[in-house]
Amino acid sequence: MLVIGESINASNKSVAEAIAGRDREFLENLAKAEAAAGADFIDVNAGAGYSSPEREMAAMEWLVDVVQGATDKPLTIDSDNPSMIKVALGKYRGERLIINSVTAEPERLESIGSLAAERQAWLVALAMGTSGIPNNVEERLAACDQIMEQLTHLGLREEQIFFDPLVLPIAVDSTQGIVTLKTLQEIKSRYPDARTVMGLSNISYGLPNRKLVNRAFLLMAAYAGLDAVILDPLDAKTMGFIKV
């Protein structure tokens, strides 16, 4: 199973501060730690909410440069903004990469899908359309069908697509874990050459003993056909589950 290190994300306060302050050493050390812990890819997310598009682009460009200089691990470019992704791809020197992510929303699917096809990147596709996250398996699969049709039309191969079945907190709706696992199984059945990925920590949001919940769900997802996971590789016990 591929591991995508999630730590270099501006939703984390310390990372956001490091990006804003251009603290190269902090981010280099974090990237090196994720790589040493066993991450196969390093996710980079420079965040949003900047005072201008130019500042937003500059932050992503700088972040990609810092992280790829700290490790030889390939990167996951984490943004749903086509302009941000294009800037990041222009700075990225590696051959292997993942773009994270698209939905079935037509305009961004076209623009981001085209960027992925041009670079022959792997692409994460969320099982949702324009109306938010579906709460049932059928609507998530319908979104996957739309995405697959468009991306293959743009020139991506099935095996370049990582479908994310979507993970919602079971503290809010206890049925959502089952919905995710069933969606995962159906994706693998419909598209045997496609890959699957999920962000693990969402499942336990709002619960005590979150790491225990995460580990239990990871095992169930692996059994259902999960190919890759976005998580904190510095959590040695969870990484131990993957290495078993």
What spans do the regions from the language model cover?
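Structural preference for beta-strand elements that scaffold enzyme active sites
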Residues: 1-3, 40-43, 74-76, 96-98, ...
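Active-site mouth loops of central-metabolism enzymes
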Residues: 4-29, 53-55, 100-106, 131-138, ...
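Acidic (Asp/Glu)-rich catalytic clusters
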Residues: 35-36, 69, 89-93, 110-121, ...
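Glycine-rich, proline-tolerant flexible connector loops at the mouths of alpha/beta enzymes
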Residues: 35-73, 165-177
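Catalytic beta/alpha-barrel core
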Residues: 43-46, 73-81, 96-107, 124-127, ...
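Active-site-adjacent beta->alpha loops and helix N-cap segments on the catalytic face
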Residues: 51-62, 79-87, 104-117, 132-142, ...
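Alpha-helix-loop-beta-strand connector modules within alpha/beta enzyme cores
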Residues: 53-79, 83-94, 181-198
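Catalytic alpha/beta core domains of metabolic enzymes, predominantly
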Residues: 119-244
